Design a protein with these regions (language model features):
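N-terminal leader/linker segments that initiate helical-solenoid repeat arrays
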Residues: 28-95, 99
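Bacterial N-terminal signal peptides that target proteins for export
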Residues: 2-15
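Canonical tetratricopeptide repeat
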Residues: 125-126, 160, 194, 227-231
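Alpha-helical adaptor scaffolds
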Residues: 114, 118-186, 190
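Terminal, low-structured helical/coil segments at or just beyond the last alpha-helical repeat
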Residues: 32-51, 66-68, 201-238
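Bacterial N-terminal signal peptides
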Residues: 12-24
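Register position in tetratricopeptide repeats
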Residues: 98, 132-133, 167, 201, ...
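TPR/TPR-like alpha-solenoid repeats
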Residues: 129-130, 164, 198, 231-237
Length: 238
């Protein structure tokens, strides 16, 4: 990006873009335990703590911890159980993420962490925040790996994780994850499209074309469908 800016007409725009990248880039830190038996790398970003995974790992006062406890208690009482409370905040988190409301999405998944810090969906959701909001593929992958080990993973977990590995240009790592993803969600067209990409990038054209054939029958999303047409041409599938 720096090279492009040196020769760019719009130098002010490039300078601003570089500033945004610098602000978004995570600060390096140590490993922190964020649930019993669960440790992650402490990564923070230049945005309000509520917009960051795990509230930016901020040290909370006794009063703030008490407010968290009150929130969790009230939510459980309102919904009827801890499981239902988790389901409520998670649904709001995914809805906000799908609408591009990243601050709200982060807040909801952070609230899910307060409600049930051991659950897989907490790390799945915050991995999506790390990837989409901050472009931090390393942290996203770390959280996806945690999510794989925690209770009650969503069926979409491996599909989302495999996609991140593809975006990170790691098709060899992505393929086994995506092979499992299409077993978990055999009707999810996008997972088949991503698997086809991984197979093709790993040199297995025939297997890639086989995945293309399945993907075409599963109605992938519009963006994935465009990728599918391009991939089919590149792989010269029949």
């Amino acid at each position: 990006m720096m090279g492009r800016c040196l020769f760019s007409f719009a130098s002010k725009v490039c300078a601003l873009a570089l500033l945004v990248v610098a602000l978004a880039y995570p600060a390096l830190a140590d490993t922190v335990e964020i649930a019993q038996g669960v440790q992650v790398t402490k990564r923070t970003y230049a945005v309000p703590t509520k917009d960051q995974p795990f509230f930016g790992f901020a040290d909370k006062t006794a009063a703030q911890r008490e407010e968290d406890d009150k929130f969790v208690k009230a939510l459980i009482e309102a919904t009827g159980s801890r499981e239902k409370a988790l389901d409520e905040v998670v649904k709001r988190g995914w809805r906000a993420l799908g609408s591009g409301k990243y601050s709200e999405a982060a807040l909801r998944f952070n609230q899910a962490w307060l409600v049930a810090p051991e659950q897989s969906v907490v790390y799945h959701g915050l991995a999506a925040i790390a990837q989409i909001r901050f472009g931090d593929l390393d942290f996203a992958e770390e959280l996806f790996r945690v999510a794989q080990k925690q209770p009650n993973p969503l069926k979409m977990l491996n599909a989302d994780y495999g996609r991140v590995l593809l975006v990170a240009k790691r098709p060899k790592d992505a393929q086994p994850v995506l092979e499992q993803a299409v077993k978990d969600t055999p009707d999810f067209g996008d997972a088949w499209v991503n698997l086809a990409h991984a197979r093709f990038q790993n040199g297995d054209r025939d297997a890639a074309c086989a995945a293309v054939d399945v993907a075409m029958k599963q109605r992938p999303s519009s963006n994935a469908a465009v990728d599918l047409v391009r991939l089919r041409n590149d792989a010269q599938c029949k």
